């Protein structure tokens, strides 16, 4: 019995201790916890007293209003996401002040109960969108008609919320955007290229989406062009998930596009449809650009990302692949780039090349020179029409501060380039820098993106491009395409791609990319 009495005594003592733990004590612990995080809130906390006045006096064009409860674990977990977006628009360091007012109301506080009832809050968190003055004296109900206050449906992550806002106001804001005053100074910063891997994935997916939207693969010629570009991506795209997605499309291509006529069926049950493939994974596109984001919604973006993709491909090929890469890039732009004037101008520059490329250096320098010629032409047009990006004017690249050794001499009208130094710079900037600087400064992006990018940005292993006959002989002898075997759905599919000369002839392929993917991770580290 004495043991039972001891347990009862301990229970009473614990109850007394719990009772003595006052709300003030809990508040102290809360303060200690918050001091650990010590993060400044950018979202404006509203209550029943200041609600109308804050919205009435706001100069912002739009507002987001979050209703939450401080006791709600989901609300606490969501707060960092909401704050990521709020820092763009609110506070002294706002990147885009005066565009969107980010606010929140705690429904767990008694004075706010009636306010929350006016908006029919039945779960937490719940987000609303409207011009600020519409919230003044406003209310919302699920059965109300013609209410300018609308519910935000896509909000669960910072990315989703910002993408939703972008759609509402036709913007292209990104979570990592800086103040515009800092952007121009950073354009020549080598470390900025570390963000371009995300833009390369974005541009790859957007190019694929454009092909789907325009149903652009409609003949054996366009089919062959698409296949060649896929082969180039499988071998040398700097993102692993884009290499994987490209390979999956490539090996299923004869089912998707028999006789060069592709299926674009949108029905979920249509297995043999291009729309069922994600060339860079299901998480892409994200809906915004980073390195390539312009100061205006209509500038830079996709075209910039496509250029970065082509440059990154050009510095990853080997000598024997240079002509194949040149043909693949030129044909892809000619068949699938929908800006007609740009397409024709680029095609003319491709046609001006009379001698086949033999060295990887040659294709990298040709693409660099071509890009500068395009910039010169566009700069004249944009300066005369006022259509350029004031924060990112077209320039001869690289600027001297980015690569002083690239310049032998320069005047206002002419530059004498050191092409050896330019090539070294291109290799480093679009190759090594695309990986190493990002890994060094990975804290600047979200944890999820760091984890993904650490895997995605490994430089692909060496690839070999050989004539069709030799490729078939090697395939028969050594079962090449070993690494792609994991993507082959059946052994029959493998034989169709590796052993069937009629299949290859059907697309008039002069060369075949043979990417083994068989190097170890330690070998990839050496390549970096």
UniProtKB/Swiss-Prot annotation:
InterPro entries found in the cross-reference section = ERV/ALR_sulphydryl_oxid_sf (IPR036774), ERV/ALR_sulphydryl_oxidase (IPR017905), Sulfhydryl_oxidase (IPR039798), Thioredoxin-like_sf (IPR036249), Thioredoxin_CS (IPR017937), Thioredoxin_domain (IPR013766)
The cofactor(s) it depends on are: FAD
Task: Quote the PROSITE patterns the UniProt record gives.
Answer: ERV_ALR (PS51324), THIOREDOXIN_1 (PS00194), THIOREDOXIN_2 (PS51352)
Organism domain of life = Eukaryota
**Active site (UniProt):** 72 (nucleophile), 75 (nucleophile)
GO cellular component terms, semicolon-separated:
extracellular region; Golgi cis cisterna
Could you say which residues bind FAD here? 300, 307, 311, 341, 345, 368-375, 394, 397
Gene induction:
By salt and norspermidine treatments and phosphate starvation.
Which keywords does the record carry? Answer: Cell wall, Disulfide bond, FAD, Flavoprotein, Glycoprotein, Oxidoreductase, Redox-active center, Secreted, Signal
Reported EC number(s) for this entry are 1.8.3.2
Record-level GO BP terms? positive regulation of potassium ion transport; response to cation stress
The signal peptide stretch is: 1-19
EC category name: oxidoreductase
Q: In which tissues is it expressed?
A: Highly expressed in roots.
* Thioredoxin domain boundaries: 35-170
- Catalytic activities: 2 R'C(R)SH + O2 = R'C(R)S-S(R)CR' + H2O2
Gene3D superfamilies attached here?
ERV/ALR sulfhydryl oxidase domain, Glutaredoxin
Which cysteine pairs are covalently linked by disulfides here? Answer: 72-75, 292-304, 339-342, 403-406
State if Electron transport is listed as a keyword. no
- Compartments, as annotated in UniProt: Secreted, Cell wall
Q: Which residues are glycosylated?
A: 47, 186, 297
**Family annotation (Pfam families):** Evr1_Alr, Thioredoxin
Per its database record, what is this protein's job? Sulfhydryl oxidase involved in the regulation of cation homeostasis. Positively regulates shoot accumulation of K(+) and inhibits accumulation of toxic cations. Acts at the level of root K(+) efflux systems involved in xylem loading (root symplast-xylem interface).
What the entry lists under PANTHER family is as follows: QUIESCIN Q6-RELATED SULFHYDRYL OXIDASE, SULFHYDRYL OXIDASE 1
Query: What remark does the entry add?
Result: Plants lacking QSOX1 display more sensitivity to the toxic cations lithium and sodium than wild-type plants.
Instruction: Supply the name of the protein.
Output: Sulfhydryl oxidase 1
Organism field: Arabidopsis thaliana
């Amino acid at each position: 019995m004495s043991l039972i009495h001891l347990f009862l005594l301990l229970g009473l003592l614990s109850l007394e201790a719990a009772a003595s733990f006052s709300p003030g004590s809990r508040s102290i612990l809360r303060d200690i916890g918050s001091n650990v995080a010590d993060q400044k809130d950018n979202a404006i906390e509203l209550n029943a007293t200041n609600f109308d006045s804050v919205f009435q006096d706001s100069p912002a064009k739009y507002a987001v209003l979050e209703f939450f409860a401080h006791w709600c674990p989901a609300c606490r977990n969501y707060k960092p996401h909401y704050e990521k977006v709020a820092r763009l628009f609110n506070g002294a360091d706002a990147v885009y002040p005066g565009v969107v007012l980010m606010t929140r109301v705690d429904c767990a506080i008694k004075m706010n109960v009636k306010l929350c009832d006016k908006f029919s809050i039945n779960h937490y968190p719940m987000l609303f969108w409207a011009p600020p003055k519409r919230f003044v004296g406003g209310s919302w109900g699920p059965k109300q008609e013609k209410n300018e206050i609308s519910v935000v449906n896509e909000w669960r992550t910072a990315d989703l919320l910002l993408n939703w806002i972008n759609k509402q106001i036709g913007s292209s804001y990104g979570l990592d955007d800086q103040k515009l005053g800092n952007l121009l100074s950073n354009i020549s910063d080598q470390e900025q290229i570390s963000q371009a891997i995300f833009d390369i994935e974005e541009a790859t997916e957007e190019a694929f989406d454009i092909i789907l939207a325009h149903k652009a693969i409609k003949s054996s010629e366009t089919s062959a062009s698409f296949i060649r570009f896929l082969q180039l991506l499988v071998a040398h795209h700097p993102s692993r998930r884009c290499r994987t997605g490209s390979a999956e499309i490539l090996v299923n291509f004869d089912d998707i596009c028999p006789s060069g006529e592709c299926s674009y069926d949108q029905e979920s049950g249509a297995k043999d449809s291009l729309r069922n493939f994600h060339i860079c994974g299901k998480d892409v596109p994200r809906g915004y650009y980073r390195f390539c984001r312009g100061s205006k919604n209509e500038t830079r973006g996709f075209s910039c990302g496509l250029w970065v993709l082509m440059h990154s491909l050009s510095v990853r090929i080997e000598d024997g692949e240079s002509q194949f890469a040149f043909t693949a890039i030129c044909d892809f732009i000619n068949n699938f780039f929908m800006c007609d004037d740009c397409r024709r101008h680029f095609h003319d520059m491709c046609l001006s090349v009379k001698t086949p490329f033999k060295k990887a250096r040659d294709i990298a320098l040709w693409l660099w020179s071509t890009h500068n010629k395009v910039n010169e032409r566009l700069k004249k047009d944009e300066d005369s029409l006022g259509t350029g990006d004031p924060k990112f004017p077209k320039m001869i690249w690289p600027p001297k501060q980015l690569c002083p050794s690239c310049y032998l001499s320069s005047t206002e009208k002419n530059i004498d380039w050191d092409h050896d130094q330019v090539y070294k710079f291109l290799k480093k900037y679009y190759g090594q820098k695309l990986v190493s600087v990002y890994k060094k400064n990975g804290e600047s992006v979200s944890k999820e993106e760091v984890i993904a990018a650490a895997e995605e940005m490994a430089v692909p292993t060496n690839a070999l491009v050989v004539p069709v006959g030799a490729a078939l002989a090697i395939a028969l002898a050594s079962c090449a395409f070993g690494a792609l075997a994991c993507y082959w759905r059946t052994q029959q599919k493998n034989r169709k791609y590796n052993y069937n000369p009629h299949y290859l002839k059907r697309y008039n392929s002069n060369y075949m990319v043979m990417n083994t993917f068989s190097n170890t991770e330690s070998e990839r580290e050496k390549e970096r």
